[in-house]
């Protein structure tokens, strides 16, 4: 609602589907569109847009899987899928699907080689170093 946006600086459409334990850090400027779907244990930093690219009926916004990190200022646009365990770098513009476990950076976003990381402990999202081991995310 307009009142919530004025207080929080966040614009989440009431029809967007948001999973459990989604953490929106420094939430100012976050926009989540009407048909967006956000999975469980997702971290979204300030200035992120999960937006549409058309006004056509039906699915227009991204689907974000579980255990995803979306860096500050990133734009994820259109009816695309961001797979489980993906990391999206700050200010990246993502307009194509990102397969599970990949890192996407840049404008337009490109995939980095898969990190050599043990993915069995994805539920340990409370570890403060979980997301901050990819220097390219902050360039």
Indicate residue ranges for each PLM-predicted region:
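Left-handed beta-helix
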Residues: 8, 13-14, 19-20, 25-34, ...
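A transmembrane-helix-recognition feature enriched in membrane-embedded lipid enzymes
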Residues: 1-7
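C-terminal segments of enzyme domains that contribute to small-molecule binding surfaces
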Residues: 58-77, 81, 107-139
């Amino acid at each position: 609602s307009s009142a919530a946006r004025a207080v929080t600086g966040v614009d989440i459409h009431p029809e967007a589907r948001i999973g459990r334990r989604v953490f929106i850090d420094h939430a100012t400027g976050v926009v989540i569109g009407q048909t967006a779907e956000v999975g469980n244990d997702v971290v979204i930093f300030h200035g992120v847009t999960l937006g549409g690219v058309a006004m056509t009926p039906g699915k227009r916004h991204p689907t974000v899987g579980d255990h995803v990190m979306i860096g500050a200022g990133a734009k994820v646009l259109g009816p695309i899928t961001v797979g489980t365990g993906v990391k999206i770098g700050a200010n990246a513009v993502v307009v194509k699907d990102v397969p599970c476990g990949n890192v996407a950076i840049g404008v337009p976003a490109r995939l980095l080689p898969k990190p050599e990381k043990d993915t069995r402990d994805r539920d340990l999202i409370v570890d403060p170093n979980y997301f901050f081991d990819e220097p390219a995310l902050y360039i």
